UniProtKB/Swiss-Prot annotation:
The lineage of its organism: Bacteria, Pseudomonadati, Pseudomonadota, Gammaproteobacteria, Lysobacterales. Pathway: Amino-acid biosynthesis; L-isoleucine biosynthesis; L-isoleucine from 2-oxobutanoate: step 3/4; Amino-acid biosynthesis; L-valine biosynthesis; L-valine from pyruvate: step 3/4. The active site is at S515. One of its GO terms (cellular component) is cytosol. It comes from Xanthomonas campestris pv. campestris (strain B100). Mg(2+) binds at D81, D123, K124, E489. It comes from the Bacteria. This is Dihydroxy-acid dehydratase. The gene is ilvD.
Length: 612
């Protein structure tokens, strides 16, 4: 049987010094024979999705110790993409994912922890911790801080989220008073932003990967039911320790759970619920860390056969994450996918032997269990707060309408084509991604003239100055992992296109990425990126670009001979932006750029550069 990793520092005469230090943290004689379980928290007062996490690590710690483990908590960093957006702060967002993964690895390996509880929530924190978990491959369970409640105002006929505040602010016809009302109403509570944006998408995907508990992605942060998720996560961490160190059960480890089949399940869910395109980036990165051969071609294959069963903001103003929970949460979406023959239901989870067992226990349309039904009735209270577990409001009824409700069955899907697609062509040889759930069907095939910008800042200025016209394809390049560096999100350009009335009349193509709040014909992750010699760096103003989502293609309508000539010219000039960009690229960012791969590889470090 495997020995506790912690035995390295807790046993033997030569470890007297280490034990003395452990004792100084509060450990007693009897603790040195127990598993030491690390709790990676991510509390910060900078991020609404993390502002309520301060005491939750200790909540988990007490439960771990109650059931026989030793708990030791530490914190990672957390960047708020919304606050960092629109200025040089966004250069740090994606690189922070690697820092988070490294920090978890450093703490866990330096102290020889036996298991891990990841308390995450927002955009780069869940992916960073997921990457670390798959690197470390020790018993791990995820529990998130939960989604924010949707905002409410008398000035709108639908609930609000962050994107509504951004779009109205860019609308010149909106009064200052209306903008202020939206701003004050859009983000009423602690938690990750209330739509199917990156944070919530990733927290939902951990359920499909099998690494978190039912409800992890959908119980609002303010609800008392989420406290039980934290307590149960502590108990599960100890159970996983017993299964691995006491029984050498490989399905107690992340790599035994998050297999190729589990990654296919997670991507299938992502496509079915129209999740953020960033999830593709993060799943690819996590797969690389876990040595799982899951890539863009697999995503492309899945996108052609998985229907869209759930439609949530920003793809529709009608539903937010709180509505997904009322409809049965992720387990109900997985249930519909399973009945459609679209899942590997034999995949393991941290809480059941198989995913099939989990669905059988938690799918509200199949289970006649009052406790399960009551759990999924947990709803918002509509009271602004930054306090976790501060309310116990419940919906009167569940939404189990699978023909016209928030979650549909396969026969009544919102679309038989899923919510995400991978496009290939001469402008993106290694692929690019589009959130089809947010694209109006009238522009699924689009041909337009290129309007080229060498930075997000220039594109924003151009859009606001009315340089972009209906029928244009806005091209924003040198914003990839290397070129940015840091692969900025392009939420401001897409929001401003909407505010100018061009949301259904233009396309946007970039080697950068998009916020989970983006909708419209927004195509990101163009690979290879311009800074790596990608063809997006060869586009010139006025070039015709043809986008065909049904055919999964995107092409620059320029002859091969002309492209070859342009490439020769660009090789001589160097693959860098023509304009001088007023951004400060620090040593830390340069170090990230030096090793970063393009988006089709998850923008992870190029290990060949390190190994070679």
């Amino acid at each position: 049987m495997p020995e506790y990793r912690s035995k390295t520092s807790t046993h033997g005469r030569n470890m007297a010094g280490a034990r003395a230090l452990w004792r100084a943290t509060g450990m007693k004689d009897g603790d040195f024979h127990k598993p030491i379980i690390a709790i990676a928290n991510s509390f910060t007062q900078f991020v609404p999705g993390h502002v309520h996490l301060k005491d939750l690590g200790q909540l988990v710690a007490r439960e771990i110790e109650r059931v026989g483990g030793v708990a030791k908590e530490f914190d990672t960093i957390a960047v708020d993409d919304g606050i960092a957006m629109g200025h040089d702060g966004m250069l740090y967002s994606l690189p922070s994912r690697e820092i988070i993964a490294d920090s978890v690895e450093y703490m866990v390996n330096a102290h020889c922890a036996d298991a891990l509880v990841c308390i995450s929530n927002c955009d780069k924190i869940t992916p960073g911790m997921l990457m670390a978990a798959l690197r470390l491959n020790i018993p791990t369970v995820f529990v998130s801080g939960g989604p924010m409640e949707a905002g409410k105002t008398k000035l709108a006929d639908h609930n609000l989220d962050l994107i509504d505040a951004m779009v109205i602010a860019a609308d010149d016809s909106a009064s200052d008073e209306k903008v202020a009302e939206f701003e004050r109403s859009a983000c009423p509570t602690c938690g990750s932003c209330s739509g199917m944006f990156t944070a919530n998408s990733m927290n939902c995907l951990t359920e499909a990967l099998g690494l978190s508990l039912p409800g992890n992605g959908t119980v609002v942060a303010t609800h008392a039911d989420r406290e039980q998720l934290f307590l149960r996560a502590g108990r599960v961490a100890v159970e996983l320790c017993h299964r691995w160190y006491g029984g050498e059960d490989p399905t107690a480890l992340p790599r035994g759970i998050a297999t190729f089949e589990a990654f296919e399940n997670a991507m299938t869910l992502d496509i079915a619920m129209g999740g953020s395109t960033n999830t593709i980036l993060h799943l690819l990165a996590a797969a690389q860390e876990g040595e799982v051969p899951f890539g863009m071609r697999d995503i492309d294959r899945l996108s052609k056969r998985v229907p869209q069963l759930c439609k949530v903001a920003p793809n529709t103003p009608k539903y937010h994450i709180e509505d997904v929970h009322r409809a049965g949460g992720i387990m109900s979406i997985l249930g519909e996918l399973a009945r459609g023959g679209l899942l590997h239901t034999n995949a393991a989870t941290v809480h059941t032997r198989t995913l099939a067992d989990a669905i059988a226990q938690w799918d509200v349309t199949q289970v006649d269990d009052d406790k399960v039904h009551t759990f999924y009735k947990a709803g918002p209270a509509g009271i602004p707060t930054q306090i976790a577990f501060s309310q116990a409001t419940r919906w009167d009824t569940l939404d189990t309408d699978r023909s016209e409700g928030c979650i549909r069955d396969v026969a009544h899907a919102f679309s038989q084509e899923g919510g995400l697609a991978v496009l290939y062509g001469n402008i993106a040889r290694d692929g690019c991604v589009v959130k089809t759930a947010g694209v109006d069907e009238s522009i699924h095939v689009f041909e337009g003239n290129a309007r080229v910008y060498e930075s997000q800042d220039s594109a924003v200025k151009g859009i606001l100055a009315d340089e972009v016209k209906a029928g244009d394809v806005v091209v924003i390049r040198y914003e990839g992992p290397k070129g940015g560096p840091g692969m900025q999100e392009m939420l401001y350009p897409t929001s401003y296109l909407k505010s100018k009335g061009l949301g259904k009349h233009c396309a946007l193509l970039t080697d950068g990425r998009f916020s989970g709040g983006t909708s419209g014909l927004s195509i990101g992750h163009a690979s290879p990126e311009a800074a790596a010699g990608g063809a997006i760096g060869l586009v010139r103003n006025g070039d015709k670009i043809l986008i065909d989502i049904p055919k999964r293609s995107i092409d620059l309508l320029v002859s091969d001979e002309e492209l070859a000539a342009r490439r020769t010219e660009q090789d001589a000039k160097g693959w860098k932006p023509v304009e001088v960009r007023p951004r400060k690229v620090t040593t830390a960012l340069k170090a990230y750029a030096l090793l970063a791969t393009s988006a089709d590889k998850g923008a992870v470090r190029d290990k060949a550069m390190l190994d070679g």
